[in-house]
């Protein structure tokens, strides 16, 4: 079997959820969209369900996957519904839905639900992606709150630049949210992962931790709080070939690396088809049997190459760690000019192995 694999530490996942809930000071929806950021939504939800207040996914397909796996906790559709007929499925499977556009407000008002629905009304407080304008938000609140098909409303918005700690935009969005929601008696939801880790003064009833659940730092620099996160995913493989090159010889496609000295080259079974960044630069750290070795040459579809010159005992079969506790996924992402989100979600071909039972 090909040695590339992703080890998922469900104890670390639970630890990170507890930290998020503690920082939020209220309830927390664990965001498990995009297959739990590449970690496996079903297994992650099953691991968290005994203590999670609920889950958040992007769409109804992701929610139904969890329901079919036996997850009974509340599930919120972050993008709401895309077609009118999805409302019947939302009611049937007892899902919560975001309402973020005028047409969704109209569709919900026209829907004769067999059971009252819990709705999260979304304000565009400055991100300008999804969300109602302040005027439409207030009108929707007045219209929906008295309808028999509505059980309760939660008021929410989404922070656009909370990962930029020197930016005033987060405070401006929080003020806009508070002003628009003034006088509305309902629970609120504002803070995402960077909001929880970087903006302690913000308060709401429901937080929505995503990236931090998986142990990744949303900020360029670590802090006392981000240091408490535990990486959930460790990506490993093995050396599958070793060769010695004389000075002046190139390595890989495009001869991007040329040996300046006699160089011992190790080939690792991990490539960009597995989710490793294709344009990782020469020198990107790779952990070979616990020792940092530099990446050399262009990353191929199925393989990458490392300089083993300073690691003479490494050989075929030696274990390799691409990210985990070291290098951390956020650090690797920054070095490769991509986001940690991309790396985690892009791990499609690598089999996952879970370190603890889902219901531990």
UniProtKB/Swiss-Prot annotation:
One of the GO BP terms on file: D-alanine biosynthetic process
GO cellular component: cytosol
Name of the gene this protein is made from: alr
Modification N6-(pyridoxal phosphate)lysine, positions: 33
A GO molecular-function descriptor: alanine racemase activity
A Pfam family annotated for this UniProt entry: Ala_racemase_N
CDD domains in the record: PLPDE_III_AR_proteobact
Active-site positions on this chain: 33 (proton acceptor), 253 (proton acceptor)
UniProt protein name: Alanine racemase
Reaction(s) catalysed by this chain's protein: L-alanine = D-alanine
Cofactor dependence: pyridoxal 5'-phosphate
InterPro entries in alphabetical order: Ala_racemase (IPR000821), Ala_racemase/Decarboxylase_C (IPR009006), Ala_racemase_C (IPR011079), Ala_racemase_N (IPR001608), Ala_racemase_pyridoxalP-BS (IPR020622), PLP-binding_barrel (IPR029066)
UniProt binding sites for substrate: 129, 301
EC number: 5.1.1.1
Keyword Isomerase: yes
Key word Hydrolase present: no
Sequence similarity: Belongs to the alanine racemase family.
Domain of life of the source: Bacteria
Pathway this chain belongs to: Amino-acid biosynthesis; D-alanine biosynthesis; D-alanine from L-alanine: step 1/1
Keywords of the record: Isomerase, Pyridoxal phosphate
Function: Catalyzes the interconversion of L-alanine and D-alanine. May also act on other amino acids.
Broad EC category: isomerase
């Amino acid at each position: 079997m090909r040695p590339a694999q992703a080890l998922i530490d469900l104890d670390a996942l639970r630890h990170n959820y507890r930290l998020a809930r503690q920082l939020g000071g209220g309830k927390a929806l664990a965001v498990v969209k995009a297959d739990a950021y590449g970690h496996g939504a079903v297994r992650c939800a099953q691991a968290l369900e005994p203590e999670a207040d609920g889950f958040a996914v992007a769409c109804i397909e992701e929610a139904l996957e969890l329901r079919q796996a036996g997850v009974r906790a509340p599930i919120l559709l972050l993008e709401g519904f895309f077609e009118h007929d999805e409302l019947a499925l939302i009611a049937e499977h007892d899902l919560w839905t975001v309402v973020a556009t005028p047409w969704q407000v109209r569709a919900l008002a026209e829907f004769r639900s067999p059971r009252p629905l819990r709705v999260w009304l979304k304000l565009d407080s400055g991100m300008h992606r999804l969300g109602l304008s302040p005027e439409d938000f207030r009108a929707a609140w007045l219209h929906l709150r008295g309808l028999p098909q509505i059980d309760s409303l939660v008021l929410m918005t989404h922070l656009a630049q909370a990962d930029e700690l020197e930016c005033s935009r987060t405070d401006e969005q929080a003020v806009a949210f508070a002003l628009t929601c003034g006088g509305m008696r309902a629970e609120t939801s504002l803070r995402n992962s960077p909001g929880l880790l970087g903006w302690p003064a913000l308060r709401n009833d429901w937080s929505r931790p995503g990236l931090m659940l998986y142990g990744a730092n949303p900020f360029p620099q670590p802090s006392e709080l981000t240091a408490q996160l535990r990486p959930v995913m460790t990506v490993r493989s093995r050396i599958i070939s070793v060769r010695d090159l004389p000075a002046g010889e190139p390595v890989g496609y495009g001869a991007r690396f040329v040996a300046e000295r006699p160089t011992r080259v190790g080939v690792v079974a991990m490539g960009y088809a597995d989710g490793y960044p294709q344009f990782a630069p020469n020198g990107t750290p790779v952990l070979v049997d616990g020792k940092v070795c530099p990446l050399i040459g262009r990353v191929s579809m199925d393989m990458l190459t490392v300089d083993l010159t300073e690691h003479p005992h490494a050989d075929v079969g030696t274990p390799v760690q691409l990210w985990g506790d070291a290098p951390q996924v956020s650090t690797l992402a920054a070095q490769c000019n991509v986001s940690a989100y991309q790396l985690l979600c892009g791990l499609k071909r690598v089999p996952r192995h879970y370190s603890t039972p889902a219901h531990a």
